[in-house]
Amino acid sequence: MTNIHNHKILILDFGSQYTQLIARRVREIGVYCELWAWDVTEEQIREFNPTGIILSGGPESTTEENSPRAQEYVFNAGVPVLGICYGMQTMAMQLGGLTETSDHREFGYASVDLQATDALFAKLNDNLTASEPKLDVWMSHGDKVTRLAQGFQVTGITPTCPIAAMSDESRRFYGVQFHPEVTHTKSGLELLTNFVVGICGCECKWTAENIIEDAVARIKEQVGDDEVILGLSGGVDSSVTALLLHRAIGKNLHCVFVDNGLLRLNEGDQVMEMFGDKFGLNIIRVNAEDRFLDALKGIDEPEAKRKTIGKVFVDVFDDESKKLTSVKWLAQGTIYPDVIESAASKTGKAHVIKSHHNVGGLPDYMKLGLVEPLRELFKDEVRKIGLALGLPAEMLNRHPFPGPGLGVRVLGEIKKEYCDLLRKADAIFIEELYKADWYYKVSQAFTVFLPVKSVGVMGDGRKYDWVVSLRAVETIDFMTAHWAHLPYDLLGKISNRIINEVNGISRVVYDVSGKPPATIEWE
């Protein structure tokens, strides 16, 4: 079996919003990597035994006395090191150079003139008509390196940054003031490939097929002949987890699908058809709609709704697990960003942003071991693995759906009537986006039920019914988003269909709020 962890890159996180992008790019190249906090110990680095190290950017200033510093062992480990933005600055300073606050901050596009072609910039040139090779890059910095450490040379400059790139080829230390990990840097992926493959010598073994083989082997080794229980939601993560476990242990996997009454139109039947009929998994379908709706009565605050939905899920799942007396393991679809964001992860720095509705919070007395086959993977990698396992692309590439489901798309108190109306309206919206070839042009689209009524006219009669809002956004990372400029005729068609086909809705509005200041979801 291929050892997919033999060659690996260690990324030290100094707090940049782009740090996870570095890891995703390295994985895209085909090499395993892990993302750790900047204050990792020498012992931890030695234990990880990286083939190369990348120092990320960050919001701090190296001119401040207590700003983060890389562990000294990073520069004594005998492996190549690449510093990006803040990572370059701390490398320069820690090795004897000098950094200062720049008079001219650089944010946005810039053109770097290459002064020397080292191994990092080999065969890179974005402007073939210029007298000297140039790179189109993305800058985001307020400090700059003003004096090189001994052994370094300047390899790139901009009009306002005299040391935009540097290298010490003998020690295989490299620094760039720009961000090669973002798509705005034209040859960024090629630069990272030069470092990871060309300089570090990593082999590209991190592929979907090899990851599946490795995951199946590790599951078999971990659980043996024991039985495993999994909460299957029909989402990407739990679906891929289910198929990996099924491939590894077959009928020893028991999937529990909790139908909470907060799913999309016909979603429960689709899950059963896909995983029960097509893939032959053991699935227990629990119709818990009444239980969830009863618990949610009178609750209108968003976070309270989330917590209630999470608690009821745990209670329902616990009831079902008690019936499976021979189960010894609990499987979860935890993915790598969850690990990074969790306070319990090895980074030790990130705080919990929000908990998933089916992750964590399970009773201690269940005393089950934990199986997390996706723990090392980013979402795009999970999708690739799902495709290789036979899941349809349409399912894997569906827009994000919140853990609490329609519970946070019905504003205020949740009632069955509201959910039923919302399901029908949302299904029409999504259907028309597919028909008009707009579904994959937007990053996320959904309908929100507003607990207000509006006057309408139907034939000769007056109606006083509910209002829904359509929401469609375009985004790269979901940290910021623009509202999607859907064609007016498409919006008109969707509105007419909803008002005419969904009895109980009299008005459709379109949300034109960006993020920020608004969030993508309404609650």
Swiss-Prot record:
Which pathway does it operate in? Purine metabolism; GMP biosynthesis; GMP from XMP (L-Gln route): step 1/1
Recorded hits in InterPro entries, A to Z, give: Class_I_gatase-like, GATASE, GMP_synth_C, GMP_synth_GATase, GMP_synthase, GMPS_ATP_PPase_dom, NAD/GMP_synthase, Rossmann-like_a/b/a_fold
What EC number(s) does its UniProt record assign? Answer: 6.3.5.2
Where does the chain bind ATP?
A: 233-239
CDD domains the record matches? GATase1_GMP_Synthase (cd01742), GMP_synthase_C (cd01997)
Give the reaction(s) catalysed: XMP + L-glutamine + ATP + H2O = GMP + L-glutamate + AMP + diphosphate + 2 H(+)
Entry keywords, A to Z: ATP-binding, Glutamine amidotransferase, GMP biosynthesis, Ligase, Nucleotide-binding, Purine biosynthesis
Q: Does the keyword Ligase apply?
A: yes
Q: Where's the GMPS ATP-PPase domain? A: 206-398
Q: Which GO terms describe its cellular component?
A: cytosol
PROSITE patterns noted in UniProt: GATASE_TYPE_1 (PS51273), GMPS_ATP_PPASE (PS51553)
Offer an example of a GO molecular function term for this protein.
GMP synthase activity
Active site per database record: 85 (nucleophile), 179, 181
Report domain Glutamine amidotransferase type-1 positions: 8-205
Q: How does it assemble?
A: Homodimer.
Q: What does this protein do?
A: Catalyzes the synthesis of GMP from XMP.
Q: What is this protein called?
A: GMP synthase [glutamine-hydrolyzing]
Q: From what organism does this protein derive?
A: Actinobacillus pleuropneumoniae serotype 7 (strain AP76)
Q: What gene codes for this chain?
A: guaA
